[in-house]
Structures are given as structure tokens and as C-alpha cells.
């Protein structure tokens, strides 16, 4: 892989440079290899492609708009800001793009049961949605901490027929849910399809999820050429595991004129131990079947991640992001909880759009940058999801802030 072609990975072993690979139990290796064969065959099958296009159009509601955020642009006083409106998809986020692709693959492989992990609940909702549509039983592993802060999505999953398994090990968040889902998969390899929600896990998952999400960037490229007659100057997206970001970024990686920025969750600050910024505060290691950047202590043990956003509260990042960081094609920065909350409120007041707290991290970075850019600079922000699920978190934070203010007075 040369640095003039950033889109050619992974190699036959699932590696992006030194990142990725297949670090799985011996019992899972035949299944992972079989999944890779089936995926490669499906990609080349016109019927599979046709069926996926049908569901993307008539079920998900694609293409979604590329929207000029006029009032936010005026407020920042610099770059012209566009939103790629993934929150308008069926289920309210980008997650459904990947779930449609994987459930069609599961059906093609004759699998009878779906399992998934979820943090913010949006991947769980999207998985439960496709399971209902295709008549498959579905088990969702979700950390007990995340269940408490995402009650609305838990109820949605149950309405859709999914069984929710609370995970109390560790910190009860996304990392722990993924551990339990992998244990289930090892036990039920013959009839179960593990529908991973981000660009992580053993090969072929990082590449497969990226490919299913790349419709975001493909549409953005077409829509920007139609609206402005040229490519955007910059792209901004939040990064937890990193599937919405990779979906937006990948079609543009070989367009050298396009600056690409991934935004990690800075929590209370990367200099503290309360953040989820794996690239800005981590080191390479192996977790959940792939080698990538991870939050680790001096003994190589995975440390707890923190973010106000459940969907970014993960101590790792997709291996392709790790590669793009090392070769410096993408710039990765971090935004704190407080900065994300400020951007959340500004987006609500200026654009009448309530974004997910994950998305608010990207908005905060976009607003910082836009102010210092020319008014002919075209910036695209991936509006990865809507904020309905985050109402309780925001309410709690506002109540706590008011209480603190009262004490100061």
C-alpha cells in the first residue's frame, strides 16, 4: 500500500499497515474466514447489490440531504458549513446503513440468529429493526451503565422484539458489551451472525462495515459537486469506533485537496484519566480481534474510557483510523464534554436540529475551525445521529450545572 493510494487497504491478512488483522479464538477462525469469503462473493453479486440498493432507498430513505447550515455559518462567520443528514435515516442515525448490508449477508449465509453489541443504543435499535424486518431472533448486549443512560433506546429495542442482555462486568459500557457478544458468538458459531456496529473487530469487519457506510461519502461527493461544482475543502466527523467517520472519509481519501478531521471524545480533557481519545491518549495494542490504538495503563491493561456520549465511550478505535493517523492523511483531535454540550445547544438554537451528543463533538470542532477560515471554504460535517436518545443526559447535566451555579451564588 503506497501513501498515494490510501483506499487500497486492507491487505489479504486484513491489515492496514500494521493495524487490523484477525486476533480471534481458534474456534472462531473458520467462521471469520468463511465470513470473508461470503462477503467477497456478495460484493461481486449483482443481485446482492440490487437488493441492498432497494432497502437503502425504500426502507432507510436514502439518499439523505446535504444541507447548507446557513445560520450556523453566519454565527461562525467563516467557512460555509454543510451537514450530511444521517440523522434523517430510518432509526435516526448512520447505523442502519451497515445493518442492512450485514443482515442481507446473514440471510445469504443461512444464519438464523443475530447478536450485536451497543453503547448509545443506536446500533442496537438498527440491529433490532433489521431483525424484525427479516424475521430473525435478536440478542443485544448492552452495558448496565449504558442501559441506565439510554432508557429510551432500550425500550425501542424491546418494542422491536430484541432481547436485551445487561452486562455488569468492567464499567458496564461498550467494551464490556462487545466482550460478552464475542463470548456468545464462540458458543453459537453455527447458527449465529454477529452484527458488529463499527469499523473494528477481526477482519473482514473493519473493511465490511466501512464499505457499507461508504454510501455517506459517495452521496456527499455527488451532492457537493451538484451544489457547488467542486469537492469540499474539509470533512469533519466524530470518532468512537469510527464508522460514520470512515463512511464519510473513505471516498475522499485519495482526493489530496480535501482536508479530513476526525474528532475523538476528550471527556474531561486528554490530560486527565477521564476521556475516550484513543489516538490522542493511547498506544497500540490488541482488543476485540484487531490491533489498533487503545487506552492502556503501564502494564498494558485496558483502562476505562469516559465520555458524556455513550456512543464514543470506547477505549479503542477502528484499525483503519489508526493507520490514517500514522500516515497523517487524517488529523485526529479531541473535544471535551463541555465543548460538545455547547455545540449541541448552538445547533438546536441556530438550525432547529437536535443532534446526538456524538455528533456534537464534530460540530464543536467544525465551529472552532470555521471561524478562522475564508467564506469560500466548503466544510461538511457528518450529522451522524439525532439527539432524542440524549435528552435525559442533557437534562441531568443542565440540572447539575444549575445546582452548582446556585451554590456559587
UniProtKB/Swiss-Prot annotation:
GO terms for cellular component: cytoplasm. Pathway: Amino-acid biosynthesis; L-tryptophan biosynthesis; L-tryptophan from chorismate: step 5/5. It comes from the Bacteria. Its cofactor is pyridoxal 5'-phosphate. The modification N6-(pyridoxal phosphate)lysine is found at residue 95. It catalyses: (1S,2R)-1-C-(indol-3-yl)glycerol 3-phosphate + L-serine = D-glyceraldehyde 3-phosphate + L-tryptophan + H2O. InterPro entries: Trp_synth_b_CS (IPR006653), Trp_synth_beta (IPR006654), Trp_synth_beta/beta-like (IPR023026), TrpB-like_PALP (IPR001926), TrpB-like_PALP_sf (IPR036052). The keyword Lipid biosynthesis does not apply. CDD domains: Trp-synth_B. The keyword Nucleotide-binding does not apply. SUPFAM superfamilies: Tryptophan synthase beta subunit-like PLP-dependent enzymes. GO terms for molecular function: tryptophan synthase activity. Keywords: Amino-acid biosynthesis, Aromatic amino acid biosynthesis, Lyase, Pyridoxal phosphate, Tryptophan biosynthesis. It is an enzyme of class 4 (lyase). Pfam families: PALP. Its EC number is 4.2.1.20. Belongs to the TrpB family. The beta subunit is responsible for the synthesis of L-tryptophan from indole and L-serine. Tetramer of two alpha and two beta chains. PANTHER family: TRYPTOPHAN SYNTHASE, TRYPTOPHAN SYNTHASE-RELATED. This is Tryptophan synthase beta chain. The gene is trpB.
Amino acid at each position: 500500500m503506497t501513501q498515494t493510494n490510501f483506499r487500497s487497504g486492507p491487505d489479504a491478512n486484513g491489515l492496514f499497515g500494521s493495524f487490523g488483522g484477525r486476533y480471534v479464538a481458534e474456534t472462531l477462525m473458520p467462521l471469520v474466514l468463511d465470513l470473508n469469503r461470503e462477503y467477497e462473493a456478495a460484493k461481486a453479486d449483482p443481485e446482492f447489490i440490487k437488493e441492498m440498493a432497494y432497502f437503502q432507498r425504500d426502507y432507510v430513505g436514502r439518499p439523505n440531504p446535504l444541507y447548507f447550515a446557513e445560520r450556523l455559518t453566519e454565527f461562525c462567520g467563516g467557512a460555509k458549513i454543510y451537514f450530511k443528514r444521517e440523522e434523517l435515516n430510518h432509526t435516526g442515525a448512520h447505523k442502519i446503513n451497515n445493518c442492512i448490508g450485514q443482515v442481507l449477508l446473514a440471510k445469504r449465509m443461512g444464519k438464523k440468529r443475530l447478536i450485536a453489541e451497543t453503547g448509545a443504543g443506536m446500533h442496537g435499535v438498527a440491529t433490532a429493526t433489521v431483525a424484525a424486518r427479516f424475521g430473525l431472533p435478536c440478542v443485544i448486549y448492552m452495558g448496565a451503565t449504558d442501559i441506565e443512560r439510554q432508557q429510551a433506546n432500550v425500550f425501542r429495542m424491546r418494542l422491536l422484539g430484541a432481547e436485551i442482555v445487561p452486562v455488569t462486568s468492567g464499567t458496564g459500557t461498550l467494551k464490556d458489551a462487545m466482550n460478552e457478544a464475542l463470548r456468545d458468538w464462540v458458543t453459537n458459531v453455527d447458527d449465529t451472525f454477529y452484527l458488529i456496529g463499527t469499523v473494528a473487530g477481526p477482519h473482514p469487519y473493519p473493511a465490511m462495515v466501512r464499505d457499507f457506510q461508504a454510501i455517506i461519502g459517495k452521496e456527499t461527493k455527488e451532492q457537493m459537486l451538484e451544489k457547488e461544482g467542486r469537492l469540499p475543502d474539509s470533512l469533519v466527523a466524530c470518532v468512537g469506533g469510527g464508522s460514520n467517520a470512515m463512511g464519510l472519509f473513505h471516498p475522499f481519501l485519495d482526493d489530496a485537496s480535501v482536508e479530513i478531521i476526525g474528532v475523538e471524545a476528550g471527556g474531561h480533557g486528554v490530560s486527565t484519566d477521564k476521556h475516550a481519545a484513543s489516538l490522542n491518549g493511547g498506544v497500540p495494542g490488541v482488543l476485540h480481534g484487531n490491533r489498533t490504538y487503545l487506552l492502556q495503563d503501564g502494564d498494558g491493561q485496558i483502562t476505562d474510557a469516559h465520555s458524556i456520549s455513550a456512543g464514543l465511550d470506547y477505549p479503542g478505535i477502528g484499525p483503519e483510523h489508526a493507520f490514517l493517523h500514522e500516515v497523517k492523511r487524517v488529523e485526529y483531535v479531541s473535544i471535551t464534554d463541555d465543548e460538545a454540550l455547547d455545540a449541541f445547544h448552538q445547533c438546536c438554537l441556530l438550525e432547529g436540529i437536535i443532534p446526538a451528543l456524538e455528533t456534537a463533538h464534530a460540530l464543536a470542532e467544525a465551529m472552532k475551525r470555521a471561524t478562522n477560515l475564508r467564506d469560500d471554504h466548503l466544510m461538511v460535517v457528518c450529522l451522524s445521529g439525532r439527539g432524542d436518545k440524549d435528552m435525559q443526559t442533557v437534562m441531568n447535566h443542565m440540572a447539575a450545572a444549575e445546582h452548582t451555579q446556585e451554590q456559587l451564588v
